[in-house]
Amino acid sequence: MKNTEKISPSEKIRQKLQEEKILEKISYSDFVKICLEFVEYFIFPLSNRELGSYIDYSKDFLWEKIDENKIYKYQNEAFKDYLNLSEQLEKSIQDVVCLCLNYKFLTSYYSEWTVESKNPIWFKSITHYTLDSAPTFLHYIGDIDGKLCGDFYEYLKVYIKNK
């Protein structure tokens, strides 16, 4: 039986990043900075709203100008703004904004599903999820426009080449 399931643009690019080990060539903090730049230059122009302050909050957090409590406050404001949006494009852009204000996205390293035994006889295990930054970012930008995933891939490659 032939597999006819279509692979999403975000999944295609995730696979390329994994195969080419691109994310292993940069630090996590560089990855986050690249994501923020990409959002600012490629995604915000697609919106009818002024969104620059959101990225400024993320940068201020990275540069330790604001603390964890402030970034949570700004993320909550972004979620509230999302609830007032009606256009799907604006909602998808706001999803990216919320991700860029996410404390774990701004601070955590790439991680995946992990299963930990909470029972000494391994009878029962509990699955924990920690934000897996690269696939999540690709998924959200792919929801705006699948072409953005390829653009991000190229943007990353240029960054690494010029590093």
What is each residue range found by the language model?
Residues 1-163:
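Structured binding/interaction patches within domain cores
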